C-alpha cells in the first residue's frame, strides 16, 4: 500500500480513538448537538478502521508465512507458499476496499432532495414525457422505500406535466439521484402522429439537495414577495375553499417557488421556504465551485435537445447515457423504476475518477 494511504489511515486511527473517548465524556453526552455530530463521524470512521485492522492482520500473516518459506521442512515450505498466495489475494481486496472508503464524501449525499421536472422542446409530447419521467422516479422511490410528495404541478393539455416539483425523503436520496440533473431526450412516435414518424422531445430534470438548518442560507424577509391563492382541487368535498397555496418570489434573484399540495397554508409556506433555500444554496454552490459542473457532466439548461445527458429511444427499446457512453436495451424496465441500471454505472465511473485522483 502507498505510504500516502497508510499515513491517512494512521491519522484516521488516531481520530477514531479520540472520538471513542469523546463519546464517553460526560460533557459531550450532555450536549446533544455535539454528541450527534461525533456519533455521526464515529459511524463513518468505524468501518474504515475495521477494514484497516483486518489489512494489518493479513499483512502480519503474510510476513509470518514468508518467513516460513525458508524452513528446512519441505511440507512447511509448501504450506507457506499457499498461505503467502492467499494473504496476497486478501491484501489486494482489502487495499481496494480501503481506497474506496477513503474517497472524499459528498456531504450532501445523505440529504433529501427537491426533484424538478420540466417539459422543454417538443410541446405536448415533452409534457407527456415529463409525466413518464415522474412515474419512473416515483417507482424508483417506492423500490428504495423513499417517501415522495408533490409540492407543485402544472399539467399538460394532453397529459403529463409542463412542470412538476416533488420532495423526496429517505436514505441517501441525493447520493443516488445527483447525476440525474440535465436534459433527458425522448425519441418515439406520438399517439397523435398519423404518419408513424418518430418525434424528438426533451425535458429537464434538476435534483437539489435539501439543506438542513445548519447550512440553510439566511433569507431576509424583506427580499420576499409572498402571494396566496386558491389551490386547484379535484372538486367534491375535498375542493380547496381557502387560499392555502403559496407562491414566494425571491426579489434579488427572481426565483419563484410555489407549493399548493397541502391544505394548510402554514405547511405550504414551510415547504416553499425549504425549496427556496435549496435553490439559493444550489445557485451559490454552483457559482462558487464551477468544478462541480465537470462532475455533473452537464448542468440543467433550457431543455434544448443539444444539451442531452440521456436519450430514451422507444422504437429500439434503448436508453443511452451520453456521459459514459452507456447503452442499455431495457427501456421498459428502466421506466418501471429500474433506474439503478443507469445510476450504478454512473456512480462507478465517478468513483473510478476519484480513485484515479487519489492515486495521483
From Swiss-Prot:
Keywords associated with the record:
Cytoplasm, Methylation, Protein biosynthesis
Q: Identify the stretch annotated as signal peptide in this record.
A: none
Q: Which SMART domains match?
A: PCRF
The UniProt record lists the keyword Zinc? no
A GO molecular-function term, please? translation release factor activity, codon specific
Q: Which GO terms describe its cellular component?
A: cytoplasm
**Modification after translation:** Methylated by PrmC. Methylation increases the termination efficiency of RF1.
From the Swiss-Prot or TrEMBL record, state where the protein is found: Cytoplasm
> By its UniProt entry, which HAMAP family does this protein fall under?
Rel_fac_1 (MF_00093)
Give the UniProt family note. Answer: Belongs to the prokaryotic/mitochondrial release factor family.
| Function according to Swiss-Prot or TrEMBL | Peptide chain release factor 1 directs the termination of translation in response to the peptide chain termination codons UAG and UAA.
State the protein's name.
Peptide chain release factor 1
| Protein species of origin | Pseudomonas putida (strain W619)
Amino acid at each position: 500500500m502507498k505510504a500516502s494511504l497508510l499515513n491517512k489511515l494512521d491519522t484516521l486511527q488516531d481520530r477514531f480513538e479520540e472520538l471513542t473517548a469523546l463519546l464517553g465524556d460526560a460533557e459531550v453526552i450532555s450536549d446533544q448537538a455535539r454528541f450527534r455530530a461525533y456519533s455521526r463521524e464515529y459511524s463513518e470512521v468505524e468501518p474504515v478502521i475495521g477494514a484497516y485492522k483486518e489489512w494489518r492482520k493479513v499483512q502480519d500473516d503474510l510476513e509470518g508465512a514468508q518467513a516460513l518459506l525458508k524452513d528446512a521442512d519441505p511440507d512447511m515450505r509448501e504450506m507457506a507458499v499457499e498461505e503467502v498466495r492467499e494473504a496476497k489475494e486478501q491484501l489486494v481486496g482489502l487495499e481496494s476496499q480501503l481506497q474506496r472508503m477513503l474517497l472524499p464524501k459528498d456531504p450532501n449525499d445523505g440529504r433529501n432532495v427537491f426533484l424538478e421536472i420540466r417539459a422543454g422542446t417538443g410541446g405536448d409530447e415533452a409534457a407527456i414525457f415529463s409525466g413518464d419521467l415522474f412515474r419512473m422516479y416515483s417507482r424508483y422511490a417506492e423500490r428504495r422505500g423513499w417517501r415522495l410528495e408533490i409540492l407543485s404541478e402544472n399539467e399538460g393539455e394532453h397529459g403529463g406535466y409542463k412542470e412538476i416539483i416533488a420532495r423526496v425523503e429517505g436514505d441517501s436520496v441525493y447520493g443516488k439521484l445527483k447525476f440525474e440533473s440535465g436534459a433527458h431526450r425522448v425519441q418515439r412516435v406520438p399517439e397523435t402522429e398519423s404518419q408513424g414518424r418518430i418525434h424528438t422531445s426533451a425535458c429537464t430534470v434538476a435534483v437539489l439537495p435539501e439543506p438542513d438548518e445548519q447550512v440553510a442560507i439566511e433569507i431576509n424577509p424583506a427580499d420576499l414577495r409572498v402571494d396566496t391563492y386558491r389551490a386547484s382541487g379535484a372538486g367534491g368535498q375535498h375542493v380547496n375553499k381557502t387560499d392555502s397555496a403559496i407562491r414566494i418570489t425571491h426579489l434579488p434573484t427572481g426565483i419563484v417557488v410555489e407549493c399548493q399540495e397541502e391544505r394548510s397554508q402554514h405547511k405550504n409556506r414551510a415547504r416553499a421556504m425549504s425549496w427556496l433555500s435549496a435553490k439559493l444554496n444550489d445557485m451559490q454552490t454552483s457559482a462558487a465551485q464551477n468544478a462541480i459542473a465537470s462532475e455533473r457532466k452537464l448542468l440543467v439548461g433550457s431543455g434544448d435537445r443539444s444539451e442531452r445527458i440521456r436519450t430514451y429511444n422507444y422504437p429500439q427499446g434503448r436508453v443511452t447515457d451520453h456521459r459514459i457512453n452507456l447503452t442499455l436495451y431495457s427501456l421498459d424496465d428502466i421506466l418501471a423504476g429500474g433506474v439503478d441500471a443507469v445510476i450504478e454505472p454512473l456512480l462507478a465511473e465517478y468513483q473510478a475518477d476519484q480513485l484515479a485522483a487519489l492515486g495521483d
